Regions:
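N-terminal secretory targeting modules
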Residues: 1-84, 88-107, 271-291
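Structural recognition of the beta-strand scaffold that forms the well-ordered cores
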Residues: 80-85, 114-119, 143-149, 183-188, ...
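Extracytoplasmic/secreted proteins, especially bacterial periplasmic and envelope-associated proteins
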Residues: 83, 123, 127, 163-170, ...
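Oxyanion-hole/transition-state-stabilizing segment in secreted/luminal serine hydrolases
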Residues: 90, 94-104, 125-169, 174, ...
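Active-site machinery of serine-nucleophile hydrolases
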Residues: 108-115, 124
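Proline-centered flexible-loop/turn and helix-kink motifs
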Residues: 111, 180-181, 215-217
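Second-shell loop/turn segments in exported
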Residues: 116-118, 154-161, 193-196, 247-252
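Catalytic His-Asp segment of secreted/periplasmic serine-dependent ester chemistry enzymes
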Residues: 193-291
C-alpha cells in the first residue's frame, strides 16, 4: 500500500487538496522509485493542473530548446547558478525588436557564475515540473537556483491562486528532490496589468507567509514587486509589452526593468552562491508610454 509522501503534505494547499484523503494503490512487489511530482501527479485531478508534469514537445522550438539543454549539460557541470522559469527568464537569451537586448545583463550578473538558463517562454509550473523530471538538471550541482514561475498559470491558463500556489510548492519540492544541496531563491510573481494581477497578489501573499518564516531552510523568498511601481502605479515604461504593435498589457520587463530586477536580487544571489555582490550600473527611468 502506498500513500502520498509526508514531505509533500507540508504544504497547506497540498494538504488540503491531496493529503487529507491519502491516495491508496494496490502494489505488487517493490514500488518503483518516484519523484515528488510523479507521486503528486498520481493524486491530481482535473482541478489540479498546476501539479501535473506536462510537456510541450509538440511545439518545435520548445522541444528543440529542451534537447539543446540536455545536450549542453556536460559543459555546464561546473555551473554555480540556475535560472528556472518562463519567458521573463528565457528573455536573457534574446535580443528583441526594436531595441531590447538582454544579453549584457546576463553577461554582467550571471555569466561570471557559469549560470544555466532554464527559462522557457509560455511555461507554467506543470511544464517546469516535467522539465525537471526529464533531465534538465541531471548531473548538476549548482550552489543556487533562482525560480520565477506562475504568471502563465494565472494569466493565460486561468488557474486559481490556490492551484498556482500548489504548483509553485511542487516546483520547490521537485528542485529539492533533484538538487538537495542547492539553495533556492524563490521570487514572487511580477506585477502585471493583466486581469490576473489580483490573483498574483494572492499567490505572493501565500508564498510570503509560507516561505519567509524560514520553515524551509533551502528557500529564500523575495517579492520585488515594489521596484516596478512609481508614484503608486505600475510603471509601464519598464515593460516592453506596451511598445509592441498592437500594444499589450504590461507583463514582461524590458531591458531596463530586467536590469532593475537583477540588481534588486543581486545581494541575495551573491550570499546564496557565496561570492561578492556585483555592483549595478546606474539606471534612469524613461517616461511611460502614451496610450
Amino acid at each position: 500500500m502506498r500513500t502520498l509522501p509526508q514531505s509533500l503534505c507540508s504544504s497547506a494547499v497540498v494538504a488540503a487538496m491531496l493529503c487529507v484523503l491519502p491516495l491508496t494503490l494496490q502494489a505488487q512487489g517493490p514500488a518503483p522509485t518516484q519523484t515528488p511530482t510523479q507521486t503528486v501527479a498520481l493524486t491530481a485531478t482535473i482541478r489540479d493542473p498546476a501539479i501535473v508534469p506536462t510537456d510541450r514537445l509538440s511545439v518545435p522550438w520548445w522541444a528543440q530548446r529542451h534537447q539543446a539543454i540536455l545536450d549542453s549539460l556536460p559543459s555546464h557541470a561546473d555551473t554555480e547558478l540556475l535560472l528556472i522559469g518562463d519567458s521573463i527568464t528565457n528573455n536573457y537569451d534574446k535580443a528583441l525588436p526594436p531595441n531590447e537586448d538582454f544579453q549584457p545583463i546576463w553577461q554582467q550578473y550571471y555569466a561570471p557564475r557559469k549560470a544555466l538558463n532554464l527559462g522557457f517562454s509560455g511555461d507554467t509550473t506543470a511544464n517546469v515540473l516535467w522539465r525537471l523530471d526529464h533531465g534538465e538538471v541531471d548531473g548538476l550541482h549548482p550552489k543556487a537556483a533562482i525560480v520565477l514561475i506562475g504568471t502563465n498559470n494565472t494569466g493565460f491558463f486561468h488557474e486559481t491562486a490556490e492551484e498556482t500556489e500548489t504548483g509553485i510548492d511542487a516546483v520547490v519540492k521537485d528542485i529539492e528532490h533533484h538538487l538537495p544541496e542547492t539553495k533556492i531563491l524563490l521570487l514572487g510573481i511580477l506585477p502585471t496589468r493583466l486581469p490576473s494581477k489580483d490573483l498574483n497578489f494572492d499567490v505572493n501573499s501565500y508564498l510570503g507567509s509560507h516561505y519567509a518564516g524560514g520553515e524551509d531552510p533551502h528557500v529564500t523568498y523575495m517579492d520585488i514587486s515594489v521596484i516596478f511601481y512609481q508614484g503608486g502605479s505600475l510603471n509601464d515604461s519598464i515593460f516592453y509589452d506596451p511598445y509592441l504593435n498592437p500594444p499589450r498589457a504590461s507583463l514582461h520587463p524590458n531591458t531596463l526593468g530586467q536590469r532593475m530586477m537583477a540588481s534588486a536580487i543581486e545581494s541575495t544571489v551573491a550570499r546564496l552562491v557565496g561570492d561578492t555582490p556585483i555592483k549595478p550600473l546606474p539606471v534612469s527611468l524613461p517616461a511611460s508610454p502614451q496610450p
